[in-house]
Amino acid sequence: GKPFIVTESVSGLMTRGYYRMPSDSMFIWPERWDKPFYDASFSCSSYDNCHVPWGNRHEGTMRHVKNNDFISGQYVWTGFDYIGEPTPYGWPARSSYFGIIDLAGFPKDVYYMYQSEWRPDKAVLHLFPHWNWTEGQDIDLWAYYNNADEVELFVNGKSQGVRSKGKDDFHVMWRVKYEPGTVKAVSRKEGKTVAEQEIRTAGEPAQIRLSPDRSTIQADGKDLSFITVEILDKDGNLCPNAENDVTFAVEGAGFIAGVDNGSPISMEKFKDNHRKTFYGKCLVVLQNNGEPGGVKVTATADGLEKATTAIKVK
């Protein structure tokens, strides 16, 4: 009963965008810290069902913290992926799988589990994975949520049932047969809708979307804008398996500070004018060159409609 803080917890392993089913299987990799490990995917499942033998799942550790008053908190290993220590793999893995957020700054799915627990002021509903699979395949759909009594899942308008979390649960799950179309989750409290989320089957890659985290930066030669790059189909749906090589051009008071995509096995340069997308996304970082004025960023890829975004510099 002595009060303490968990100073290094979890050590769960995840690759953003990669899912290994059934989701209630557990993968403890490697067998020992000093024993080489190999899996052809060089990936770890984002269902929170993969961790090191000296650690635990994110949900398992959170359960210990919530259910034991003598634990005042935890330091999760880790918030972000980082270069080096590519547990459980060796070459060509060159960065870690431990993060809640990947190396490019994109949240992995478990980010929303923490948000649902730590942000009671925010209605959270996060349904995953994507909805591009093989016809008839059994797919496990998870939802992290808060501020609600239940979540109902619909596949192409047909209810797949209502789920509620038990005392020690942090997500709800449905196992359904895949059919192209739309999956929708609706969370409710006392019968009233709290939040909704839809995921649609994506078609072929058709266009690029650029989303800067800030549309205005300072003219100090240091300030940055982090621009998310996404590959979309003609209807604006994220293509979850896209690996298009995107090239960037900058005009005006700025330059490319770096690029990334979050892949732990990518050998691409961080300082370059192009990057392949990883599960449909990559990142380009724009830096001011010390001058005021505007900056225009253009993204192009073979066979796709180009995209542009403008950043103000003051």
Kindly give the residue locations of the regions a language model identified.
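Extracellular Ig-like/FN3 beta-sandwich strand-entry sites
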Residues: 178-182, 224, 292-294
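Low-complexity, acidic Ser/Thr/Pro/Gly-rich terminal tails and inter-domain linkers that flank the onset
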Residues: 202-218
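Extended substrate-binding grooves/exosites of carbohydrate-active enzymes
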Residues: 1-166, 171-178, 182-192
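Short flexible loop/turn segments that cap and initiate beta-strands
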Residues: 146-160, 196-198, 224, 234-267
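Beta-strand-rich structural segments
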Residues: 141-145, 186, 211, 215, ...
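Short, hydrophobic beta-strand segments
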Residues: 172-178, 271-290
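Beta-strand-rich extracellular modules
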Residues: 188-190, 300-304
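Edge beta-strands of extracellular beta-sandwich domains
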Residues: 192-203, 305-313
